[in-house]
């Protein structure tokens, strides 16, 4: 765990992943002659940008004029003792090991459903990230 604390996992790494997804989506759409007004992506990951290990979702929305907006979901903490395992594998595998395998968690509900006792799901976190990303679009020039 000492080795893990030396590593700085910035939230920008998650943003880069989400931006790459949008870039690839736009390329796919162009290659397959698919027209869209907006291109959306979401990326989830672990970071310690606040000095604590957290899982955060970042949504990126880009239009055809390369105007981009992004938003984040609420983040939730990862215990220090589990952070290194999450970095080496992924959150789902660590949760399987700690909480037991659960097919519901691997579908729409996500591990956050278990951690919040059914108060929040993966869909909720994804929705919040996209709503935050949409603020630049729904407010026009006022918020750009």
Model-identified regions with their sequence ranges:
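Glycine-rich phosphate/diphosphate-binding loop of Rossmann-like nucleotide-binding domains
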Residues: 1
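Anionic-ligand binding patches
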Residues: 5-144
């Amino acid at each position: 765990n000492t080795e893990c604390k030396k590593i700085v996992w910035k939230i920008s790494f998650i943003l880069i992943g989400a931006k790459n997804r949008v870039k690839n989506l736009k390329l796919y759409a162009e290659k397959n002659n698919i027209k869209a007004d907006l291109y959306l992506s979401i990326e989830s990951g672990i970071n310690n940008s606040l000095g604590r290990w957290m899982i955060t979702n970042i949504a990126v929305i880009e239009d055809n004029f390369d105007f981009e907006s992004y938003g984040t979901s609420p983040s939730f903490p990862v215990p220090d003792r589990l952070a290194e395992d999450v970095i080496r594998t992924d959150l789902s595998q660590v949760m399987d090991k700690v909480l037991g395998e659960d097919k519901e968690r691997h579908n729409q509900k996500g591990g956050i459903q278990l951690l919040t006792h059914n108060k929040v799901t993966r869909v909720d976190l994804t929705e919040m990230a996209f709503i935050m990303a949409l603020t630049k679009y729904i407010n026009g020039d006022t918020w750009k």
